[in-house]
Regions:
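Chalcogenol-based redox active-site neighborhoods
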Residues: 1-143
Length: 143
């Protein structure tokens, strides 16, 4: 069961695709779209990532940050980002600590769930049913 609207988003620090540290607190004051997905370079996950890529400018115009999280490692994320020219940050969670903190552990992978976190670190929206082809636009409509 995913975390609820109104809950303070769990803080985390992990590595991005380049091995650099990334923390939720790095984006204080901004809307963060924290999207969890099962696996790099698989059909549904690729469509979802491409949707965020194609809408990236619209997210920037709304001062929103996109963070994609899966249990893949940094190298896998780096290859996925390069292959599909993804302009946003992918967060590696191989130890599943973030996945578990956000209650989206699918038993070895992250469930496809998205949290919209406001600038004060509170969850404003939760998407537990995701249509990978339209998900990025569905979220934008509510920002």
């Amino acid at each position: 069961m995913a975390l609820s609207v109104g809950t303070t988003a769990p803080r985390f620090t992990a590595q991005d695709s380049e091995g650099n540290p990334v923390s939720l607190s790095d984006f204080a004051g901004k809307t963060v779209v924290l999207y969890f997905y099962p696996k790099d370079d698989t059909p549904g996950c690729t469509r979802e990532a491409q949707g965020f890529r194609d809408s990236y400018t619209e997210y920037q115009n709304k001062d929103a940050v996109i963070l994609g999280v899966s249990t893949d490692d940094c190298t896998s994320h780096q290859l996925f980002k390069q292959k599909y020219e993804l302009p946003f940050t992918l967060v590696a969670d191989p130890d599943k600590s973030i996945t578990k903190a956000y209650d989206v552990d699918g038993g070895g992978y992250a469930k496809r769930v998205t949290y919209v976190i406001n600038g004060t670190g509170v969850i404003d929206q939760v998407f537990t049913t995701v249509k990978t082809d339209t998900h990025a636009q569905d979220i934008l409509a509510g920002l």
